[in-house]
Amino acid sequence: MPAPVVLILAAGRGECFLASGGNTHKCIGWRQSPEVAPYRWPFEENGRTFDLAIEPQITTNDLRLMLRLALAGGGITIATQETFRPYIESGKLVSLLDDFLPQFPGFYLYFPQRRNIAPKLRALIDYVKEWRQQLA
């Protein structure tokens, strides 16, 4: 199930981003590992998809750290909407440029179709299914 991507900023920190190419604001970047290129932020405009290579003040592979930094006013960051939903709804974070952000295709869970699935895997499968239904 597709999920909206959201660009977020701590409430009260300003909003202009795309016009400047994203490089005049403090940004919090994501990098899966040192061997992988930093994540480029995806955008859509007039049916055209493009992405920006940002110049972050800090780069991390820890989503919780990204969230804490954003909440502390450390910069703009990007993730799926469900990651930041409670903070946007409470007004602690502000969603930016919603009209320019693409849909994230979603996560997939691959597992063997056997009768005797290990109880821990069955619990994970059931949890993920329930979690996705709550988001729908």
Curated annotation (Swiss-Prot):
What protein am I looking at? Putative LysR family substrate binding domain-containing protein YagP
Record the organism. Answer: Escherichia coli (strain K12)
Matching entries from InterPro entries are given as: LysR_subst-bd
Coiled coil, from the record: none
The cross-references to PANTHER family, in alphabetical order and at most eight, read: HTH-TYPE TRANSCRIPTIONAL REGULATOR (PTHR30537), HTH-TYPE TRANSCRIPTIONAL REGULATOR PGRR (PTHR30537:SF1)
Mention any additional remark: Encodes the substrate-binding domain of a transcriptional regulator.
For this chain, the family text in UniProt reads: Belongs to the LysR transcriptional regulatory family.
